[in-house]
């Protein structure tokens, strides 16, 4: 319940950022400075979106990352996320990789605090110290991740395990520290301070979102991660996150990730000196028995905190079967095609896919003026200070979602019982008096819709009393004696929305009778001018109110004592309390699978060895769409639809020289090309209505699905084609959606959507003679795939916006 309470408190004050001290110009300057050092990379930056489990290596065979899908048990991630969600708080320490804004991030476990104003170093984080009793909730997920790491990269795991001081292990693993990120899209960075000779691990432990892939920036590959996915990776390569894929700004999403690593400064001589000092001090207290009785120094290796060297791999669609674990049976054959396709001067991509892997003068990328801010989710919003809170739509809508937190059910976990009782009584009294006055108003005018507030009424005095209680509730939720302006804004907005809703729902008043503006004006009276009523009261009433205010404050402080003591104790904690939070996890009692057995099962298909060379012939079948219409001659002209008028998006699409070359070229399927023999690669061509019956290593569907408008028939065709390949299927199609779609301003998205289908349909008519091509979005294409979609490859600059989905011929077991 402690973690749940902290999560509630954090969410109450997690309102849109309102920074009165920063002008829009200052925010823009901060953003520009941050992205200059740490740029954001959109999905379109990379040529590969990797969806399945796989091993990603660089050009010299070094592992960049190993990703495993659904590799963590649900109970383990659920337990960990319930605790760790409250560790991610607004922090300016990582603002440079969030466009100059403060992201939701935090650390747990042990930390060195080198370079920090915290006086005492090399110890438990405040989060672990404050949650010591609940800390065991993270042990299962830490154990599972450690065992997966050990099975995937045993030598790296061993080196890290041998180096980490035993005092700072999390549950006996080679991890000392966890970094927890919530709704945090990181800009390009490397992780500084991790163990050079080991790897870090990242797991998504909760969320409901699309996009936000982990990108290896120098290798141009996006790794999609969803809840329960794990990746063991070299965090010294530059990495970042792609954009979140939401259709509108109001669409809700959440994402919680945890990074597991060894913070090497904890193994340096200065940290060992701190451990020994604490141990010697503890020995002076005969009543204290440390969990660890000695400090054994270990070799920590050389840690330079430099980016890993980059040995790039020239990408192609045939590189992807070499990565995917489920396609290892055809990896050597794919390697033969990949090496031939990426050789200097090779035209194999044009032969197999009908166009090159990259086109330099294709559809242009967007400028920053057309895009949303990469960290726009937390951007500064305009402040309309009309009283006690901001009346901007975003603040009010956010408060409407959070008003439930002022219900007794939630407050009972967050403030003292005495203060809660005062809140309930003051709230009930004010509502009683409002109801009494409203009933009287309706007697005078049954058609009345607006509540008339009387400043000298008993109801007004009850409102001020409720505000006094509310103020102490706010401070009790914050666990401090004074609130920041932005915290006051958040609370009073929620307070007003809560009371307005109570009048409507409990007193059955019209929705706007007790309006937010009315409450805002009265809150302004309370917060900034309420004392003018106080001075007119009789002395005995003034004394009664002063005593009442003191009792409310004492009720609030009574509930805060324990929390404040715990936090203050951490700042001054100089004890040798290493590993006091550790305990045994009884996997058998809970009927949980043992970490070693679980890791063995989820890593059984992991391949990290070099691929053998394929000597036999590699058979590739390329399927072309049947010709529907023959375009007479070449040099086709685009017909501008009547609905377009003067669309800048239409002008942008048709401005590409590559588009004009495509229109001037002959149709690609006027007749079947002859078979091609390229080294040991044999390529055969057929029309989509005459599929053969013999087997091939690979089958390529070249814009075939655009000829099949019915989704059921299109999906069935994929199944038929997949049955012809022993390796994998390549589904090549136009993605009608702009590759930067989710980064665009909403007005530009609408303008693009209005012209893109017609534009690509005309290009298909010119290229393949398709009368009315069914061009689909990425999501629509992937919904057709009945088996496993391992990855998506994007032909760069393609005038047809061509993407290639790599599909396993069989469904997962």
UniProtKB/Swiss-Prot annotation:
Coiled-coil stretches: none
**Which keywords accompany this UniProt record?**
Dioxygenase, DNA-binding, Iron, Metal-binding, Nucleus, Oxidoreductase
GO MF annotations in UniProt: DNA binding; metal ion binding; thymine dioxygenase activity
Catalysis: reaction(s): thymine + 2-oxoglutarate + O2 = 5-hydroxymethyluracil + succinate + CO2
Span list, region DNA-binding JBP1 domain? 392-561
Leading EC class:
oxidoreductase
Q: Where in the cell is it found?
A: Nucleus
Q: What is its EC number?
A: 1.14.11.6
Cofactors, names only: Fe(2+)
Q: Where is this region: Thymine dioxygenase?
A: 62-264
Does the entry feature the keyword Iron, yes or no? yes
What does the entry give for GO biological process?
base J metabolic process
The task this protein performs is described as: Dioxygenase that catalyzes the first step of DNA base J (beta-d-glucosyl-HOMedU) biosynthesis by converting thymine to 5-hydroxymethyluracil (HOMedU). DNA base J is a hypermodified thymidine residue found in the genome of kinetoplastid parasites, which is localized primarily to repetitive DNA, namely the telomeres, and is implicated in the regulation of antigenic variation. Also specifically binds to base J-containing DNA (J-DNA).
Q: How does it assemble?
A: Monomer. Binds to DNA as a monomer.
Q: What is known of its domains?
A: The DNA-binding JBP1 domain (DB-JBP1) is necessary and sufficient for binding to J-DNA.
The family this protein is said to belong to: Belongs to the TET family. JBP1 subfamily.
Record's protein name: Thymine dioxygenase JBP1
Query: Which species expresses this protein natively?
Result: Leishmania braziliensis
Print the organism lineage: Eukaryota, Discoba, Euglenozoa, Kinetoplastea, Metakinetoplastina
């Amino acid at each position: 319940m402690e973690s749940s309470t902290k999560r509630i408190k954090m969410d109450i004050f997690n309102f849109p950022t309102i920074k009165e001290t920063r002008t829009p110009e200052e925010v823009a300057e901060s953003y520009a400075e941050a992205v200059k050092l740490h740029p954001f990379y959109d999905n379109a930056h990379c040529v590969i979106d990797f969806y399945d489990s796989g091993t990603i290596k660089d050009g010299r065979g070094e592992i960049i990352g190993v990703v495993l899908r659904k590799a963590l048990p649900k109970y383990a991630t659920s337990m960990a996320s319930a605790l760790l969600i409250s560790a991610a708080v607004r922090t300016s320490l990582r603002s440079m990789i969030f466009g100059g804004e403060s992201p939701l991030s935090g650390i747990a476990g042990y930390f060195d605090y080198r370079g920090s104003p915290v006086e005492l170093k090399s110890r438990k984080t405040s989060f672990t110290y404050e949650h010591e009793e609940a800390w065991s909730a993270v042990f299962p997920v830490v154990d599972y991740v450690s065992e997966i790491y050990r099975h995937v990269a045993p030598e790296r795991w061993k080196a890290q395990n041998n180096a980490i001081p035993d005092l700072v292990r999390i549950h006996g693993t080679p991890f000392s520290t966890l970094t927890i990120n919530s709704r945090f899209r990181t800009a390009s960075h490397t992780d500084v301070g991790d163990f050079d000779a080991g790897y870090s691990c990242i797991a998504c432990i909760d969320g409901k979102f699309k996009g936000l892939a982990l990108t290896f920036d120098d290798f141009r590959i996006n790794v999609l991660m969803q809840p329960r996915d794990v990746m063991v990776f070299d965090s010294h390569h530059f990495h970042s996150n792609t954009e979140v894929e939401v259709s509108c700004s109001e669409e809700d999403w959440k994402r919680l990730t945890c990074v597991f690593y060894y913070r090497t400064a904890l193994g340096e001589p200065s940290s060992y000196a701190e451990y020994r000092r604490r141990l010697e001090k503890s020995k002076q207290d005969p009543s204290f028995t440390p969990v660890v009785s000695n400090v054994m120094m270990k070799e920590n290796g050389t840690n330079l905190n430099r980016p890993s060297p980059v040995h790039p791999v020239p990408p192609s669609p045939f590189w992807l079967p070499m990565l995917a674990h489920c396609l290892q049976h055809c990896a050597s054959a794919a390697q033969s095609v990949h090496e031939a396709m990426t050789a200097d001067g090779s035209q194999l991509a044009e032969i197999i896919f009908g166009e090159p892997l990259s086109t330099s003068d294709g559809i242009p990328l967007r400028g920053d003026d057309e895009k949303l801010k990469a960290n726009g989710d937390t951007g500064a919003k305009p402040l309309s200070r009309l009283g006690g809170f901001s009346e901007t739509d975003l603040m009010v809508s956010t408060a409407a979602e959070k008003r439930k937190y002022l219900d007794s059910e939630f407050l009972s976990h967050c403030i003292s019982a005495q203060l809660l009782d005062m809140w309930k009584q003051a709230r009930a009294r004010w509502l009683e008096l409002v109801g009494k006055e409203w009933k009287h108003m309706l007697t005078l005018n049954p058609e009345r819709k607006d509540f008339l507030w009387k400043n000298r009424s008993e109801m007004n005095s009850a409102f001020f009393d409720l505000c006094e209680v509310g103020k102490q509730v706010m401070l009790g939720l914050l666990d401090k004696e004074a609130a920041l302006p932005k915290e006051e804004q958040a609370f009073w907005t929620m307070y007003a929305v809560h009371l307005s809703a109570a009048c409507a729902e409990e007193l059955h008043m019209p929705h706007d009778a007790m309006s937010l503006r009315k409450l805002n004006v009265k809150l302004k009276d309370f917060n900034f001018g309420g004392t003018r009523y106080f001075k007119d009261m009789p002395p005995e009433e003034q004394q009664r109110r002063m005593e009442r205010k003191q009792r409310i404050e004492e009720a609030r402080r009574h509930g805060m004592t324990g929390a404040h003591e715990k936090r203050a104790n951490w700042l001054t904690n100089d004890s040798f309390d290493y590993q006091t939070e550790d305990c045994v996890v009884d996997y058998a009692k809970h009927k949980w699978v043992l970490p070693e057995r679980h890791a063995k099962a989820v890593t059984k298909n992991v391949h990290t060895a070099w691929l053998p060379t394929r000597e036999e012939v590699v058979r590739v079948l390329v399927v072309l769409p049947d010709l529907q219409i023959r375009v007479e001659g070449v040099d086709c002209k685009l017909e501008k639809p009547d609905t377009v008028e003067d669309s800048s998006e239409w002008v942008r699409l048709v401005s590409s020289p590559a588009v004009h070359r495509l229109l001037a070229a002959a149709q690609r399927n006027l007749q079947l090309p002859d078979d091609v023999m390229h080294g040991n690669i044999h390529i055969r061509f057929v029309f989509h209505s005459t599929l053969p019956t013999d087997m091939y290593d690979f089958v390529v569907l070249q814009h075939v699905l655009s000829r099949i408008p019915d989704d059921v028939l299109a999906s069935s065709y994929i199944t038929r084609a997949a049955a012809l390949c022993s390796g994998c299927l390549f589904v090549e199609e136009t993605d009608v959606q702009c590759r930067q779609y989710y980064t665009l301003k909403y007005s530009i998205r609408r303008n693009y959507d209005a012209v893109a289908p017609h534009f690509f349909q005309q290009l298909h008519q010119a290229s393949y003679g398709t009368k009315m091509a069914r061009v689909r979005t990425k999501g629509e294409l992937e919904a057709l795939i009945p088996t496993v979609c391992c990855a998506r490859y994007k032909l760069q600059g393609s005038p047809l916006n061509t993407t290639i989905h790599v599909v396993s011929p069989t469904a997962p077991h």
